[in-house]
């Protein structure tokens, strides 16, 4: 029997791009292609790119160039594939004219067509080798679940809609089937992602779908409840990311705090507030009522005292005054957000914010970002200290002779903190990657925790 054709794969960018990569690799394996771990062992290479900020664009272009140098046969997909150069031509084809094909994001069919054109699929694929959950690039015990593509917002600093298009929600039955297959495969934590999780179903007017004969509206609250019910059957977690602060978010908080989904729909919200001053938010084309946001945060915590709120912000946006920046710092102190990231504003080619007046010097933007993070880290450290002495449920991510490393309900992988657990030899019971263990917290800093099983 002839040897199966081999495809190399490079995946860059955010978790949503990672899911695109997983879907492409799943289809490749389903058709009998093998995935090569090296350039020289591959018959061709697929590069999934990011094009959100200038650094990501350069990283993607460099990765394409490296793949061309090391292999020579390269197919490009992802957000950068939808980006034009200053001359109006495709940026990738202009910089790297030797690539075999270029597609935009979430284009599994187009990528497979390009692969077929340059590397025909084998006649006898081993379909049974592909698990129902698909091929995942994350560790076996957690996975990302993408529920929609695109975004209907037109934030002035963002070009995602120009690359990924308007919101397109996945059918609820399709989402639930993928979630079930993931839980069956041993996944202990599902991280729900999209460009705008709160808007799930807006594009289909919240139509009713069916899962195992049960009606479920294509709507965030209904989907989260269904996922929570499913997660409870497997003793697993569901974590919500990219939750735009719509009023509908208020309906999800009780699912985290009480009833059958408590402990499965995690008390964790990733909400991108971006700023707190109404004038800056207006220039960003974001919701512009910080006082109402503070009231909602307080209400959420009254309903769900264990709630962890993560958010991201932009410092040094065009036109931002020192007074407006101080308003942002006051908001961080008063809201007491648990996990916070901040970017110094950086112009993105194609973003309408580039046309705004009041651009700030690089040193001012960076200085404000640094001041922001000082305040945010102080707030985080104070909140982390309150956890000392508590016993928390921890999902183990790593185990070594030095002990275990895991995460609580307050910690998403890659972006939040971890819990350093005492060495396994001293633990009251053995544990392995993917296990849930109860850990008594003995120490904390501004980011991480230490504890004993």
UniProtKB/Swiss-Prot annotation:
[4Fe-4S] cluster 1 binds at residues 14, 50, 79. Keywords: 4Fe-4S, Cytoplasm, Iron, Iron-sulfur, Metal-binding, S-adenosyl-L-methionine, Transferase. GO terms for cellular component: cytosol. It holds the Pfam family TRAM_2. Its cofactor is [4Fe-4S] cluster. It comes from the Bacteria. Its EC number is 2.8.4.4. Binds 2 [4Fe-4S] clusters. One cluster is coordinated with 3 cysteines and an exchangeable S-adenosyl-L-methionine. It is found in: Cytoplasm. Catalyzes the methylthiolation of an aspartic acid residue of ribosomal protein uS12. Belongs to the methylthiotransferase family. RimO subfamily. This is Ribosomal protein uS12 methylthiotransferase RimO. It comes from Burkholderia orbicola (strain MC0-3).
């Amino acid at each position: 029997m002839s040897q199966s054709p081999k495809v190399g794969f490079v995946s860059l960018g955010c978790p949503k791009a990672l899911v695109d990569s997983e879907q492409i690799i799943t289809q490749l394996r389903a058709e009998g292609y093998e995935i090569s771990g090296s350039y020289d062992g591959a018959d061709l290479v697929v590069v999934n790119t990011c094009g959100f900020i200038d650094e990501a664009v350069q990283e993607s272009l460099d990765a394409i160039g490296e793949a061309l140098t090391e292999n020579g046969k390269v197919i490009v997909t992802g957000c950068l594939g939808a980006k034009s150069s200053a001359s109006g031509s495709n940026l990738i084809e202009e910089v790297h004219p030797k690539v075999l094909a270029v597609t935009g994001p979430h284009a599994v069919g187009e990528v497979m067509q390009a692969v077929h054109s340059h590397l025909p699929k084998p006649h006898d694929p081993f379909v049974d080798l592909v698990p129902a959950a698909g091929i995942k690039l994350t560790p076996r015990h957690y996975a990302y679940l993408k529920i929609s593509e695109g975004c209907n917002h037109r934030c002035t600093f963002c070009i995602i809609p120009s690359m990924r298009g308007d919101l397109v929600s996945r059918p609820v039955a399709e989402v639930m089937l993928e979630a079930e297959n993931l839980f069956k495969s041993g996944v202990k934590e599902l991280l729900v992602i999209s460009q705008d999780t709160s808007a799930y179903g807006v594009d289909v007017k919240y139509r009713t779908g069916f899962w195992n004969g049960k009606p479920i509206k294509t709507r965030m609250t209904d989907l989260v409840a269904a996922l929570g019910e499913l997660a409870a059957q497997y003793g697993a977690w569901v974590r919500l990311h990219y939750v735009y602060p719509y009023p509908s978010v208020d309906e999800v908080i009780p699912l985290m705090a009480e009833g059958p989904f408590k402990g499965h729909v995690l008390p964790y919200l990733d909400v991108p507030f971006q700023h707190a001053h109404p004038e800056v938010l207006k220039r960003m084309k974001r919701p512009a009522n910080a006082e109402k946001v503070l009231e909602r945060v307080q209400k959420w915590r009254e309903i769900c005292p264990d709630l962890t709120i993560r958010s991201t912000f932009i410092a040094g946006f065009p036109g931002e005054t020192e007074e407006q920046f101080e308003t942002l710092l006051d908001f961080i102190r008063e809201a007491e957000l648990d996990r916070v990231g901040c970017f110094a504003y950086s112009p993105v080619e194609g973003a309408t914010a580039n046309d705004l007046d009041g651009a700030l010097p690089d040193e001012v933007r960076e200085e404000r970002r640094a001041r922001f993070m000082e305040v945010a880290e102080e707030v985080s450290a104070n909140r982390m200290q309150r956890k000392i002495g508590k016993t928390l449920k921890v999902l183990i991510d790593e185990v070594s002779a030095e002990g275990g490393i895991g995460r609580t309900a307050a910690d998403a992988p890659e972006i939040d903190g971890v819990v350093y657990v005492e060495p396994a030899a001293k633990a009251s019971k053995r544990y392995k990657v993917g296990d849930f263990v109860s850990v008594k917290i003995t120490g904390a800093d501004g980011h991480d925790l230490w504890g004993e099983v």
